[in-house]
């Protein structure tokens, strides 16, 4: 298997699809990388040459923040928002939607499972 940015890529997939397995690289960015390095999109990972793999690995490490570094960066940004006591930080702290979504209904993903209060035992 090919390891790029600490992530093993599936060998039977096309290169542009396989690069999406790296956190921080989506479809658009993977195609942009391959265009820059002049690698054919339809090439399978197992058919890549050693030089192409090295070029892709070096290009990603040099130009993008990916995988654990990106996760750490995002986590530190959220912690900073909580520390400075901003509105977004408060919403993160209370585990509520951050970007202005309504919470009276339709916030189950963020708020968790609905708890039904049993009033019979009171």
Curated annotation (Swiss-Prot):
Keywords: Chloroplast, Plastid, Ribonucleoprotein, Ribosomal protein, RNA-binding, rRNA-binding. One of its GO terms (cellular component) is small ribosomal subunit. It is found in: Plastid, Chloroplast. The keyword Endoplasmic reticulum does not apply. GO terms for biological process: translation. One of its GO terms (molecular function) is rRNA binding. InterPro entries: Rbsml_uS13_C, Ribosomal_uS13, Ribosomal_uS13-like_H2TH, Ribosomal_uS13_bac-type, Ribosomal_uS13_CS. Located at the top of the head of the 30S subunit, it contacts several helices of the 16S rRNA. Belongs to the universal ribosomal protein uS13 family. Part of the 30S ribosomal subunit. This is Small ribosomal subunit protein uS13c.
């Amino acid at each position: 298997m090919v390891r790029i940015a600490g992530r093993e890529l599936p060998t039977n997939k096309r290169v542009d699809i396989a690069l999406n397995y790296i956190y921080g690289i989506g479809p658009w960015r993977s195609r942009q990388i391959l265009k820059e390095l002049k690698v054919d999109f339809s090439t399978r990972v197992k058919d890549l040459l050693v030089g192409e793999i090295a070029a892709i690995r070096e290009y990603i490490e040099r130009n993008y923040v990916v995988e654990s570094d990106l996760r750490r960066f995002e986590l530190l940004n959220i912690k900073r928002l909580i520390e400075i006591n901003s509105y977004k930080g408060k919403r993160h702290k209370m585990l509520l939607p951050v970007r202005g979504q309504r919470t009276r209904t339709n916030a189950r993903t963020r708020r968790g499972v609905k708890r039904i209060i049993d009033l019979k035992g009171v």
